[in-house]
């Protein structure tokens, strides 16, 4: 590390814990603020999604790294993990980045259906993203992944987090674990 220039030193996001939880056939991944596509001119090793994807393999549920900011969900990461469900823990008007949502929804990254759930999809962000924003399954609320006994299937339940009653807004699935 001492040999790296100061601007190439790992930051706290690069040191995030990446975690896969498996139950039966279900694999759930969350990687915190793990960085993906490096900024222009930065070393390739800063794309930490590549080694994580290689170790991870396919998953059913993917909590999108770094809040869906500008750098996560690289094509390699998506092609390797092939999630059925993406959850974006957005909280800022810059989340998700239009390029990230485009990659998540693209069947060029990997074939098959996929559903995207966004915790706080703000109106200015939707306007910036345009028609693609209409393809998300949820644009706000608390997202719960409810796994059936044995892990062969799961549902995604979106709760209204604007009050303490957490009423159900929508239920999606069942999805089959593979």
Model feature map: region roles:
Residues 81, 95-119:
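Short acidic, glycine/proline-enriched helix-loop-strand junctions
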Residues 1-47, 109-178:
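Flexible, acidic/histidine-containing loops and adjacent segments that form or flank the divalent-metal
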Residues 1-99:
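Active-site-proximal loop/helix segments of hydrolase catalytic cores
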């Amino acid at each position: 590390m001492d040999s790296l220039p100061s601007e190439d030193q790992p930051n706290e996001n690069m040191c995030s814990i990446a975690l896969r939880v498996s139950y039966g056939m279900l694999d759930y991944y969350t990687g915190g603020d793990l960085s993906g596509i490096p900024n222009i001119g930065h070393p390739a090793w800063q794309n930490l999604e590549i080694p994580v994807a290689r170790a991870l393999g396919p998953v059913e549920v993917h909590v999108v790294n770094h809040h869906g900011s500008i750098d996560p969900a690289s094509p390699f990461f998506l092609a390797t993990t092939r999630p059925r469900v993406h959850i974006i823990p957005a909280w800022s008007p810059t989340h998700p980045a239009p390029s990230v949502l485009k990659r998540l929804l693209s069947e060029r990254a990997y074939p098959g259906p996929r559903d995207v759930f966004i915790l706080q999809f703000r109106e200015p962000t939707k306007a910036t993203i345009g028609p693609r924003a209409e393809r998300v399954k949820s644009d706000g609320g608390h997202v719960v992944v409810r796994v059936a006994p044995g892990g062969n299937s799961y549902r995604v339940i979106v709760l209204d987090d604007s009050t303490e009653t957490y009423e159900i807004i929508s239920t999606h699935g069942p999805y089959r674990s593979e």
